[in-house]
């Protein structure tokens, strides 16, 4: 969806609800520059993804791991609970 800054201003609260419900960003156009309105949840996920893929070495490692899992070559492990009492 793409709207003008004036339309965004008039409908800000419904737009905030919309991006949180459908997780589709809203493109806002203006003569002074364009912007995007997205949910905080989506923004956080996006910034985490950018952080993880910023390093070419880490990106390759993650993509290789995904490929292994999709090929059925992954090994399942139990997670260690750091708060569990030690025997």
Swiss-Prot record:
GO biological process, any: regulation of DNA-templated transcription
NCBIfam families associated with the record: phd_fam (TIGR01552)
UniProt keywords, alphabetically: Toxin-antitoxin system
InterPro entries for this protein: Antitoxin_Phd/YefM (IPR006442), phD/YefM_antitoxin (IPR051405), YefM-like_sf (IPR036165)
Subunit structure: Forms a complex with YoeB which inhibits its toxin activity.
Pfam name, any one: PhdYeFM_antitox
Protein's UniProt keywords contain Hydrolase: no
Taxonomic superkingdom: Bacteria
Entry's family note: Belongs to the phD/YefM antitoxin family.
Record function comment: Antitoxin component of a type II toxin-antitoxin (TA) system. A probable antitoxin for the putative mRNA interferase YeoB.
Organism (species): Streptomyces coelicolor (strain ATCC BAA-471 / A3(2) / M145)
One MF annotation (Gene Ontology) recorded for this entry: DNA-binding transcription factor activity
Protein name: Antitoxin YefM
Organism phylogeny: Bacteria, Bacillati, Actinomycetota, Actinomycetes, Kitasatosporales
């Amino acid at each position: 969806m793409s709207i003008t800054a004036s339309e965004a201003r008039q409908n800000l609260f419904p737009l905030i609800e919309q991006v949180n419900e459908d997780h589709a960003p809203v493109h806002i156009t203006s003569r002074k520059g364009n912007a995007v309105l997205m949910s905080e949840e989506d923004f956080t996920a996006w910034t985490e993804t950018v952080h993880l893929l910023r390093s070419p070495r880490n990106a390759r490692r993650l993509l290789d791991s995904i490929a292994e899992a999709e090929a059925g070559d992954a090994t399942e492990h139990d997670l260690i609970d750091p708060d569990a009492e030690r025997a």
